[in-house]
Amino acid sequence: MKLSCLSLALAIILVLAIVYSPHMEVKALADAEPDAIGFADAFGEADAEPKRRRGLKKIIGKVIKGTGKVAGEAAASAVADAAVSAAIDAVVGTTEEPEQ
């Protein structure tokens, strides 16, 4: 009984391998990018990464820098407003806590 189950499992694996191997081969031939990256890595070329990924990294970097700049300006504005409010309170003589 164990031998027939093992034979059945191996037969199913063999059939699946035969059925799906042409599909995988076509898919591998259609996408040449992994081959190019593997070739560049194998020969130690510095430009192993596709140009579109480098472009995407530049765009993401610019977005992060811009977001950081806006957040920094907002924080500086909030600190400046709190300082002005504290200075006015000191001159006027109120003892209210500044809003946070």
Swiss-Prot record:
This is U-myrmeciitoxin(01)-Mg7b. The keyword Signal applies. The keyword Metal-binding does not apply. GO terms for cellular component: extracellular region. Glycans are attached at S85, T94, T95. Residues 18-50 form a propeptide. Its main location: secreted. It comes from the Eukaryota. Pfam families: Pilosulin. Neurotoxin that triggers pain behavior and inflammation in mammals, and is paralytic and lethal to insects. Causes a time-dependent increase in cell leak current. May act by targeting membranes. Keywords: Glycoprotein, Membrane, Neurotoxin, Secreted, Signal, Target cell membrane, Target membrane, Toxin. Very highly expressed in the venom apparatus (5%).
